[in-house]
Amino acid sequence: MHDKKFLVGLIGADIQMSKSPTLHETEARHQGLDYRYELLDFAERGLPASALPDLLDEEERRGFSGSNITHPCKQTVIAHLNRLSEDAEMLGAVNTVVFRDGERIGHNTDWYGFYENFQRGLPDVAKSHAILLGAGGAGVALAHAAIKLGIERLSIFDQDSKRAETLAGQLNDRFSRDCARATTDVGSTLRSADGLIHATPTGMKSHPGLPIDPEWLLPRHWVADIVYMPLVTELLSLAERKGCRTLRGGGMTVYQAAAAFELFTGIAPDAERMSRHFMDLCRLSA
């Protein structure tokens, strides 16, 4: 048993169903750590997302080692940090904050989580062209991972077209080639695409529904979702009925959590053990 006690958290909205506390705490027990993971939920506390600085102050005051950050704060949190890791600065989004030596340090483990999940779940799919839905805090990480995975051309759609255009420009500059563009027509873009990457809250229990017209999806498409509550979203259910290859969001959750766990503790977790435990949790809550 290690002497140090770890108190970590998750800040976000509508997060009461999150599996992160059990996922982290179970791995910590295997590692012999005294480790507690708390949820700081805007909705549960009746607070607006603008209360983010107060929740960060609370965590720091109570001696938290760090905190995960989720929707809707992955970009707004940056203004309240002292510095960013290279990945977080490059992506302009943070999903993990470490409190160390009086500083708040922002990291991004989302892109790594998606990258690892895709490599394992869809290793041999066509990657000439894919469409990304969502250019927010999660979308910027997934876009980066998509190009690193070898997707040659990425079309990006967001309800805020300027945000999609900005992300496409950032990717083209970062990778020094014309690898991304914004689109305002998902249906026609999907006709020429190999796959769809979904990075919006649509499909969560608090945001039910489909992000696309069902007719746009064809059996030849692959579909990757980041939503993991429920594990099989309406989008993935539709894709499976149509015969598409699919990638569930749970794997991304596990691999980003494993990376965050190491940032909080300095101890490398067993990611495969965490994955098995995550699937057990999903079966219990199904």
Report the location of each language-model feature:
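Rossmann-like adenosine-cofactor binding region
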Residues: 176-248
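NAD(P)-binding Rossmann-fold cofactor-contacting core
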Residues: 151-174
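Conserved S-adenosyl-L-methionine
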Residues: 148-153, 242-245
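Hydrophobic Val/Ile/Leu positions in short beta-strands of Rossmann-like dinucleotide-binding domains
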Residues: 10, 132-133, 156, 225
